[in-house]
A protein has these predicted regions:
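Second-shell residues forming the walls of enzyme active-site clefts
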Residues: 1-93, 97-100
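Mid-to-C-terminal alpha-helical segments outside catalytic/metal-binding sites
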Residues: 96-124
Length: 124
């Protein structure tokens, strides 16, 4: 139903990106090779493994295009009251400039909605 990817790096699976940013791992191995069609969630991108190497826009571009559907946004390591609005702005900007397709986001929405229906979870 759901799987969580971490920010760990395994150069046997992807020589360039950690799991949470890797299209090769998430879309290639997990979805295509293993046939997983559920929701992929990733750990908090504000964790140092990501935030020390990527800015908000780059990290969300990579995660979404890799196939991540849902994010843990803890915002507790270096609390920023504007973190969530910055993430939303970054994603909107990435869609506007064509770096993330609307269809990619719709795919995630469909998977999340399907999971919510399966477990009778309501809300918007």
């Amino acid at each position: 139903d759901m799987i969580m990817v971490s920010h760990t790096f395994d150069d046997k699976l992807d020589k360039k990106f950690p799991s949470s940013l890797s299209k090769e791992i998430i879309t290639g191995t997990l979805r295509n090779d293993l046939g997983f069609d559920g929701v992929v969630i990733c750990d908090d991108p504000s964790m140092k493994a990501i935030s020390e190497h990527y800015n908000i826009e780059d990290s969300f571009e990579l995660m979404l295009n890799a196939g991540v559907d849902l994010f843990c946004l803890g915002n507790n390591l270096n609390y920023d009251p504007d973190y969530i609005p910055k993430v939303i702005d970054a994603i909107c900007h990435l869609v506007k400039i064509g770096k993330i397709s609307e269809n990619r986001l719709l795919d995630s929405i469909k998977r999340i909605d399907s999971l919510k229906k399966k477990y009778n979870i309501h809300g918007k």
